[in-house]
């Protein structure tokens, strides 16, 4: 690649983004692709500290605007410190969540003004958008059931939210898919992991112009 390529992974809780990414990494490395994987919120020291505040199960009184601004602050630091240097070095950067999460969770989920969220995203990223977004879609109930069955997963504040919020979040993602279908590709995350990985690989390789 002559320049970096930015991919974001999005989806409701329990969609299995992390498992797919773990399976993809060795495939990409075999192709000789330099890959940086990272996550939001987090990715760098300041971002990880903000992540702890956001996801702490005891912070149930957190205001929706406070939550949004914490995500935005983490996003900016993460971008400047880690993502942009990797892109400038010509790497493939795969982010577990990015700008669309704010629209889906704080916009549709929390009911905050989406134009304001778009402005904050623009401000924090200087207009940077992913070259490709992979949206892993799954029915809310199935995703939450996966989380409940995963004893290794630490419970966070968002896991304690009611079903209604998670349904609004999924609707937000589907709305984004309708609006930005040229950038966002929907992947059926309810299928067996092997099939999801194969579909993801195909979409990613097409987007990057790599031979399969």
From Swiss-Prot:
Its EC number is 2.7.4.9. It comes from the Bacteria. It catalyses: dTMP + ATP = dTDP + ADP. This is Thymidylate kinase. Phosphorylation of dTMP to form dTDP in both de novo and salvage pathways of dTTP synthesis. CDD domains: TMPK. Belongs to the thymidylate kinase family. Keywords: ATP-binding, Kinase, Nucleotide biosynthesis, Nucleotide-binding, Transferase. It comes from Streptococcus pneumoniae (strain Taiwan19F-14). ATP binds at residues 11-18. InterPro entries: P-loop_NTPase, Thymidylate_kin-like_dom, Thymidylate_kin_CS, Thymidylate_kinase. The keyword Ligase does not apply. GO terms for cellular component: cytosol. One of its GO terms (biological process) is dTDP biosynthetic process. HAMAP family: Thymidylate_kinase (MF_00165). GO terms for molecular function: ATP binding; dTMP kinase activity. The keyword Nuclease does not apply.
